UniProtKB/Swiss-Prot annotation:
Orotate binds at F38, F39, T132, R160. It is an enzyme of class 2 (transferase). This is Orotate phosphoribosyltransferase. HAMAP family: PyrE. Its EC number is 2.4.2.10. It comes from Acinetobacter baumannii (strain AB307-0294). One of its GO terms (molecular function) is orotate phosphoribosyltransferase activity. Catalyzes the transfer of a ribosyl phosphate group from 5-phosphoribose 1-diphosphate to orotate, leading to the formation of orotidine monophosphate (OMP). SUPFAM superfamilies: PRTase-like. PANTHER family: OROTATE PHOSPHORIBOSYLTRANSFERASE 1-RELATED (PTHR46683:SF1). The gene is pyrE. Pathway: Pyrimidine metabolism; UMP biosynthesis via de novo pathway; UMP from orotate: step 1/2. One of its GO terms (cellular component) is cytoplasm. GO terms for biological process: 'de novo' pyrimidine nucleobase biosynthetic process; 'de novo' UMP biosynthetic process; pyrimidine ribonucleoside biosynthetic process. It catalyses: orotidine 5'-phosphate + diphosphate = orotate + 5-phospho-alpha-D-ribose 1-diphosphate.
Amino acid sequence: MTTPVSFHPQAFIELALSRGVLKFGEFTLKSGRVSPYFFNAGLLNDGEALSLLAQGYADKLTQCENVDVIFGPAYKGIPFVAATAVALSQTHNKSVPWGFNRKEAKDHGEGGILVGAAVEGKKVWIIDDVITAGTAIREVVTILKNAGATIAGVLVALDRQERGQGELSAIQEVQKELEIPVHALITMKDLMDYLEAKGEKEALANMQAYREKYGI
């Protein structure tokens, strides 16, 4: 068996670029802002890419406290949390229960909206790709709390490090409102450091201008 490689931001950025997960250019976001980059974790759709992402989540979780259960919000978070559970077992010798939610509750079989490990009385870490407005995270936090869970924190792939409607970023708003930590594998600063190291002056200048306008 090949030993998984530890997560490094630069290696992940390069893989994301090669898969089209990360693109530099000009992209209009739902907010109406014109961003100099775009990140779509849904394109991490092969074994190598998913494995590297999961390794990043697993490495980060070993530095966190209160990891009773890991949880992936439907739908994108489901493969992320499953792969992370495997990475925790294979590379850190930690067997961590995992679960996810359905978009709609079942009224037959085992029923309900939650699938996988029981969360009642457990400290749960939520794993997702990004927090854009924070709406989806707030919804899943409510679901988990209603099931008796304590939210230990949130782990995302990318922190855009930009303001929401106010002076705080979406991640900062979630941290303040829900009083939980939110950690990211890579940040906008990591992307800028990568561009600087590669000598991509135009893309870096566009990122710097965007950060000056919207950054935190």
